[in-house]
């Protein structure tokens, strides 16, 4: 894969989630030449660490797959936090947990509140979610889900008995079951959708970019690290191309339009390196400002999470699959049949709840796993175990990203300010207490062998917060660092109607950095939707018609609307 030209209609910087969508959609116009520049390597079909769903723990922290970012010392945690970012075609969709969650419809109603953002409400976003999905767990007549999109979604199956007990425990704790957290009712417990198809990871590159590579007007160049934007000599606001390095050599490519899709870390970094950002800050780094946009690198959001781990009394967990002696058999089973323990990401179910009555929609997310293991592969010292991942979904803590120098290869300074507000601390205390209350219900009694982490010694509010500060990890959802918003918003970077950078010509941003607020779930699906919608904007196509559908609203709809625990045909 390499470029065939020196000039293109569109140059897309980043072959990750958004870049893969854009490369495929923009090249549908046969009269337009498209180049995708990816700094990482190719996502080879034979690479087990990418393609095998259960191998998801191996790429993180591995320099061949992961850019290995770290925050600065977080001021309210007293330590640095590792951030894995995909160093491969497909970006982080090639190394993530493969969980597909749209977020709550109310997230997008919040996006649409500012002036000029009305076309980003749920009704306008829904048709693009449906366009990208093939939802095998949804009925053919389901008007909320998509049925013929490039992203193939597996529902559950969550057949391990621990899942059913966990869902029932949620009901015993006063919550409800839901058939589809991406459907009418997000609130409640039930099976999750995952981007796993025929036992393989369904990354954005596999779903979008690979099938489009047969087109003559689409080129993809890997190991191409973009170092700077090129500007018109007579117009400092007009972008005309990019410079990138590959194998130690510098290359230049010209473009009618440049689209930044490097993600929430790389996009603001490249903007600042190019003189777009806070003018005084840029001057302090020896960079001549081109456009004063103080929101570049600000408004930074992420989700923090912890694992609550339990010993399992019955031999039903997947803990034995972590035994190195069993791994060869599990691997061979996957290689030859795409079946067995390696054919699932094992994040097959969980739930969303409100931790208090002050919030209108779920502010806590739970991922349940029938195994006790950390994301880095460190397993709990038990024969059998299970765990729940939990964390607040719309924290009001905000961080920032700032370049350290003019060197494009030097990683930027990153601070998320986790746990920096009283509201954030309160929600964390609620999150742990809600999770523990669910895990101690009768439905879990046959399996509950006692809490391993944090352990019974952690009880008071301060003890809980100390544990979160010590043990909390990123859920890997960085976003909003170059947010969409009207020009009247001094912190907005991207025009929501055009995806162009305010005040600049031929420069757009399409990735997680453009999100105005993070959503209450994993952010991969919202990024795909954003890119699908942006592709129509960039191509000048008529947008898909908005679709106004019902969805569950707490305090307005009946409390049990869409709930499934009383349905005798609901298998969970």
UniProtKB/Swiss-Prot annotation:
Active site: 477
Highest taxon in the source lineage: Bacteria
UniProt keyword list: FAD, Flavoprotein, NAD, Oxidoreductase
A Gene Ontology cellular-component term: membrane
Flavoprotein listed as a keyword: yes
Enzyme class: oxidoreductase
EC number(s) reported in the record: 1.1.99.1, 1.2.1.8
GO molecular function, one term: flavin adenine dinucleotide binding
Pathway field: Amine and polyamine biosynthesis; betaine biosynthesis via choline pathway; betaine aldehyde from choline (cytochrome c reductase route): step 1/1
Gene Ontology BP annotations: glycine betaine biosynthetic process from choline
UniProt cofactor(s): FAD
A Pfam family the protein falls into: GMC_oxred_N
Binding site for FAD: 9-38
Keyword Protein biosynthesis in record: no
Catalytic activity: choline + A = betaine aldehyde + AH2; betaine aldehyde + NAD(+) + H2O = glycine betaine + NADH + 2 H(+)
Protein role: Involved in the biosynthesis of the osmoprotectant glycine betaine. Catalyzes the oxidation of choline to betaine aldehyde and betaine aldehyde to glycine betaine at the same rate.
Family, similarity comment: Belongs to the GMC oxidoreductase family.
Record's protein name: Oxygen-dependent choline dehydrogenase
Organism for this UniProt entry: Staphylococcus epidermidis (strain ATCC 35984 / DSM 28319 / BCRC 17069 / CCUG 31568 / BM 3577 / RP62A)
Taxonomy of the source species: Bacteria, Bacillati, Bacillota, Bacilli, Bacillales
Gene name as annotated: betA
């Amino acid at each position: 894969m390499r470029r065939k030209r020196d000039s293109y209609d569109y140059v897309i910087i980043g072959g990750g989630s958004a870049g893969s969508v854009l490369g495929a959609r923009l090249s549908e116009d046969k009269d337009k030449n498209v180049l995708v520049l990816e700094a990482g390597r190719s996502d080879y079909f034979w690479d087990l660490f990418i393609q095998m769903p259960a191998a998801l723990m191996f790429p993180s922290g591995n320099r061949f797959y992961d850019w290995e970012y770290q925050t600065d010392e977080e001021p309210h945690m007293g330590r640095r936090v590792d951030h894995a970012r995909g160093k491969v075609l497909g970006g982080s969709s090639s190394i993530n947990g493969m969980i597909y969650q749209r977020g709550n419809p109310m997230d997008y109603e919040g996006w649409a509140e500012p002036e000029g953002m009305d076309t980003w409400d749920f009704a306008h976003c829904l048709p693009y979610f449906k366009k990208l999905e093939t939802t095998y767990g949804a009925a053919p007549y389901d008007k909320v889900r998509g049925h013929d999109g490039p992203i193939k979604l597996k529902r559950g199956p969550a057949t391990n008995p621990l899942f059913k007990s966990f869902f029932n425990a949620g009901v015993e704790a006063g919550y409800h079951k839901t058939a589809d957290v991406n459907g009418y009712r997000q609130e409640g417990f039930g099976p999750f959708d995952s981007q796993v198809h025929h036992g393989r990871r369904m990354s954005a590159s596999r779903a979008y970019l690979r099938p489009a590579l047969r087109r003559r007007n689409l080129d993809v160049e890997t190991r191409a690290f973009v170092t700077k934007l090129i500007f018109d000599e007579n117009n400092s606001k007009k972008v005309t191309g990019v410079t990138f390095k590959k194998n130690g050599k510098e290359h230049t490519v010209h473009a009618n339009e440049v689209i930044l899709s490097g993600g929430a870390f790389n996009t603001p970094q490249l903007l600042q390196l190019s003189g777009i950002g806070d003018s005084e800050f840029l001057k302090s780094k020896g960079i001549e400002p081109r456009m004063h946009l103080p929101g570049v690198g600000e408004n930074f959001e992420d989700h923090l999470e912890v694992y609550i781990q339990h010993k399992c009394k019955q031999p039903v967990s997947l803990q034995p699959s972590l035994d190195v002696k069993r791994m060869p058999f599990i691997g061979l089973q996957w290689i030859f049949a795409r079946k067995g323990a390696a054919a699932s990401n094992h994040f097959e179910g969980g739930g969303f709840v409100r931790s208090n009555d002050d919030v209108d929609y779920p502010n806590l997310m739970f991922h349940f796993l029938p195994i006790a293991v950390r994301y880095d592969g460190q397993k709990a010292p038990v024969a059998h175990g299970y765990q729940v991942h939990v964390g607040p979904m719309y924290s009001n803590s905000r961080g920032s990203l700032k370049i350290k120098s003019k060197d494009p290869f030097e990683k930027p300074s990153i601070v998320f300010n986790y746990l920096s507000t009283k509201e954030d601390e309160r929600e964390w205390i609620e999150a742990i207490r809600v999770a523990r209350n669910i895990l101690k219900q009768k439905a879990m009694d046959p399996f509950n062998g006692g809490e391993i982490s944090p352990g019974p010694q952690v009880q008071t509010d301060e003890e809980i917060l100390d544990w979160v500060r010590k043990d909390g990890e990123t859920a890997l959802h960085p976003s909003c660092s170059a947010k969409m918003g009207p020009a009247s918003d001094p912190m907005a970077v991207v025009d929501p109607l055009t995806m162009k950078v305010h005040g600049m010509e031929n420069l757009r941003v399409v990735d997680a950095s453009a999100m105005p607020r993070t959503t209450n779930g994993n952010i991969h699906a919202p990024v795909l939707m954003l890119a699908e919608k942006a592709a129509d904007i960039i191509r000048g196509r008529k947008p898909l018609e908005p679709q106004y559908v019902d969805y569950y609203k707490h305090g307005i709809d009946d409390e049990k609307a869409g709930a499934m625990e009383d349905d005798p045909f609901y298998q969970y």
